[in-house]
Swiss-Prot record:
One of its GO terms (cellular component) is membrane. It comes from Bacillus subtilis (strain 168). Involved in sporulation. May contribute to cortex formation or stability. Its main location: membrane. Keywords: Membrane, Sporulation, Transmembrane, Transmembrane helix. Disruption phenotype: Impaired ability to form spores when associated with a ytrI deletion. In combination with a ybaN deletion, cells show a severe sporulation defect. Induction: Transcriptionally regulated by sigma-E. It is found in: Forespore outer membrane. This is Sporulation membrane protein YtrH. InterPro entries: Spore_YtrH. The keyword Membrane applies.
């Protein structure tokens, strides 16, 4: 995440980046499944389940920034950075879960299983 921007900006961006990665990736993947002759709604649901972790990684800006923040918080005693990073991860998890829920509502795939 951008260190120059304020924390709330990064917090909101983290949520919506994860949401966009999950919804966009699943819908574009569903289009690819349709073009390949596979059932698109099933493919969208499967992709949404698989993309959750990647939406989280994309939203927090890669794993090295998070690891560096944790390292700085632990080794330098800067617990504020650890708390901020945890909040950013929770925000990204919320965005990914919201995206998965929207996909679940749109496809209604859980009703046919």
């Amino acid at each position: 995440m951008d260190q120059e921007a304020g924390f709330m900006v990064n917090f909101i961006n983290s949520y919506f980046i994860a949401l966009g990665v999950l919804i966009g990736g699943a819908l574009i993947g569903g289009l690819g499944a349709y073009l390949a002759g596979e059932p698109p709604l099933t493919a969208i649901t499967k992709l949404a389940n698989r993309l959750k972790i990647w939406a989280l990684v994309a939203a927090i800006g890669g794993t090295f920034d998070a690891v560096y923040s944790f390292e700085r918080g632990i080794l330098e005693g800067n617990t504020r950075d650890i708390f901020k990073q945890l909040l950013l991860i929770i925000s990204a998890m919320g965005g990914a879960q919201s995206g998965w829920l929207i996909i679940s509502w749109l496809t209604q795939e859980h009703l046919s299983s």
